[in-house]
Amino acid sequence: MLVTFRAIVCVLVAFVLAAGSAINSRAFAADDVAKADAAIEARPAASEAELKYWLENMVRYHGFSVEETAAATGLSLGEVQKNLKAFTIQPESQKGRDSLLLLPWPSGRHPRIGFLEGAILPQRETKVSIFTPWGDHDYVVVDVPEAVWSNLGLTYLAHTHIPTVFDKQGKTLKKLEWNRHADGTLDIERVLPNGIRFGAVVRPKIDHVQMELWLKNGTPELLTDLRVQNCVMLKSASGFNAQTNDNKQSEGPYAIARSANGNRWIITAWEPLHRAWYNDRCPCLHSDPEFPDCKPGQTVRLKGWLSFYEGNDIGSELKRISVSRSE
């Protein structure tokens, strides 16, 4: 059944790509792809405690509907409603928190508005939700990493689109989950079939989120051209999710989105920087870094940042952040 479902998704994507000029047809097919993604990526909870955690994550914090929760958990609508009642879980406003809220992204709701054909089967183990200070259930989804490139080719991709070197070899990566810590920190580690290890650590602070990526070369050869894509998706951030790049800018390592009302900002940065860019179709922000060349047995690291700002002097805020990051 799974193979058949994947085949249907691939047919839909092929139709979308072939119908570039037929905007309405493409939008319809892309919406079907998003629904198929959620069904395939349903992850049943391993225990009652895990079920409660994920229901709280989805409904209390993300504000998921019963339908979205069912898609993410694999439960029926009736089972979702029964468990929400048993655990007394309901949506709660996330405005006015003392510090930023960071949670694993739960799947069930595609993190993009558009260009869905370029992100089939989004994997939840690379994605975190960082909640803005301004909305009841407003958040950005950070894909860390979305993709890792090297001299070997596309070495890792956090969804299905362009085949990776391991896809071409017929090798499948197992599903993982974020490790959750009492202070809100999330971390994860993945081992690739050729021995490369990489991982991410994401730490919530009062007014920003610190991020780190690391990679260890477990191969016998030098790894070069280690470019990384880290994507900040804006679909669920009210005031930032218009499909345009007119509200986006970059300065040094900073990629920045401005709200529709003009005085709220989402700021992200990674160093050392490879390039900053944006995609209006998703919509999303990128501050994409590059690891230094990595010898066999060596570990290399990257540092990242995400914060929110309300005010009219974005230049001064970037200077403040730069000082804070250097301390």
At which residue positions do the language-model features occur?
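Acidic-aromatic substrate-binding/catalytic surfaces of carbohydrate-active enzymes
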Residues: 102-173
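Acidic (Asp/Glu-rich), glycine- and aromatic
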Residues: 204-244
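A contiguous, surface-exposed recognition patch within enzymatic or periplasmic domains that forms
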Residues: 124-126, 132-138, 144-147, 218, ...
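Short Lys/Arg-enriched helix C-cap and helix-to-coil transition segments
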Residues: 91-106
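Bacterial N-terminal signal peptides
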Residues: 7-22
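Extended, loop-rich substrate-binding clefts of extracytoplasmic carbohydrate-active enzymes
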Residues: 154-205
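Beta-strand-rich recognition/accessory modules
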Residues: 161-173, 177-180, 260-327
